[in-house]
UniProtKB/Swiss-Prot annotation:
Coiled coil: 83-186
GO biological process, one term: response to antibiotic
Protein name: Putative adhesin domain-containing protein LiaX
Region (Binds the antibiotic daptomycin (DAP) and the antimicrobial peptide human LL-37, under physiologically relevant concentrations. Protects the OG1RF and S613 strains from LL-37-mediated killing in a concentration-dependent manner): 1-277
Name of one Pfam family that matches: SHOCT-like_DUF2089-C
Record region (Putative adhesin region): 279-526
Chief location category: secreted
GO cellular component: extracellular region; plasma membrane
Induction or repression: Probably part of a liaX-liaY-liaZ putative operon.
Function description: Involved in cell membrane remodeling, perhaps acting by negative modulation of the liaFSR and liaXYZ gene clusters, thereby regulating content and localization of anionic phospholipids. Binds to the antibiotic daptomycin (DAP) and to cationic antimicrobial peptides, such as human LL-37, perhaps functioning as a sensor that activates the cell envelope stress response.
Amino acid sequence: MKERERVLELVKKGILTSEEALILLENMATEKDEKQIEKAAEKVDTQNIGTTNKEDQVADLMNALEKGESEGPTVDSFEENTQDSAEKDRENLERILDELATKANRASAELDEVNAEIAGIKEEIKEVAEEIGTLDTKEELDALTEDEQVQRKDLHVLLAQLEEKLATQSTEKTALEEELKNIRKEQWKGQWNDTKEKVSSQFSEEWKDQATDTFNQVGGKVAEVGGQVGEFLKKTFNSFSDTMNDNVEWKDIKMKVPGVATTKFEHEFNYPNPQASLIDVKVANGTVVFKTWDQEDVKVEAKIKLYGKMAGDSPMEAFLERSDIDVDDETISFQVPNKRVKADLTFYLPKRTYDHVSVKLLNGNVLVEELTAKDVYTKSTNGTITFKKIDATMLEIEGVNGEIKVLEGTILDNIIETVNGDVSISAAPESLSVSLINGDIRITAKEKTLRRVEASSANGNIKLALPNDLGVEGQVKTNLGSINSRLTDIEVVREKKDRGNQQLHFRRVLEESMAQINASTTTGSIFLKDTDK
């Protein structure tokens, strides 16, 4: 049944008055055409003046509106105007949505470009920072040249420029993201309004009221059920937690935490018959081992580990790009100053006397199983240094954290300096100087070739064993420790045992050989004895 016929039927039954019917008919038009409907109603009302029957008045009005007898616009024309207006509104909405979509596509494309530029800048920053880190490591290894110092300054300038550019691009990215967010919000609003109008036009107000009540009831039920489920889950998890705590020893559980991606590989470097007499090894992270063999070739067994992603067609290529390896008839040079590369190197050297050997490590151990050289310098910031057998004119060892051992060999001058770690000497140096801050010093002299010993430790004991057929002139002292001597055939020249200051001056005179001994410690004790005891 049409809406107008229903209104007329209600008037006939006396449910609605003519005034109420007129108001209801006026509300059937859109808000935009209300004034036109009022004019039409007034016109129809004027034509029906004198009619005393309210039912006839409403009927005449309905006939006038349906048949178009009035001079003003009819209800059908109003509906057509309303439809035209709605169509125009829809077209405007679609046009606005198209414009918003165009703006969104443009902003999205610009954002993609900015993101690509930011990714490129970050990659450049990463490469520059890696180069700077490599040069810094070279400086720590005392291998930085003047040209590399200039290069490092230029790299720092470039890094600052890249960081400034990155900040600018990041600001632009934030602005584009905000713009795109606002556009998406406007698009959503437009689409939602369009959808809401389409949906609303399909259902009556009565149905919407019923649906609202139904959804409210359902929502209440869902909330009630959700509360019950939440309470159940809470009780379940609490029970599970108590059970796990009572029955599981968490200290026995080991969990693997994802770390930096690593690449491992092994490679063997072979160099046929080089006549090099200089060896230069500098490694940021790794272990260096020297061995000698009966062949004239040089072989280096390398175990490499690369930390993180590195550019290169292969791990070997990535390693070579970050290393400087050169072996010829003058020098055997292996330099791996990159801290993202760990290189465990084992050198097999021909048996000969080398002029100069230099080994410098930041983190790692040095092991020399056998070596003959004129001048040997070894340094490790964090790691142990061990010489099993070394024959050298000069052996200089420098450490920071780690134990130092010189077990066997003949050395003319031996200088050892370190901060933290014990020092043990059982080789046969003629001149020995040991200085450390925290750690014990143990010197065992087996040959009468010893001529001088200088040993000092701030916090640690000093143990010195001397051959009983070696003439000595010694002075030892400690502030907070004690002096204990079991040397035979010695003459005590002077002894002081004051609290906080103990000293001993002793002498054993033998015409064949004499050695000068000086040892001091602040908080430790000094122990003297014969080597054979």
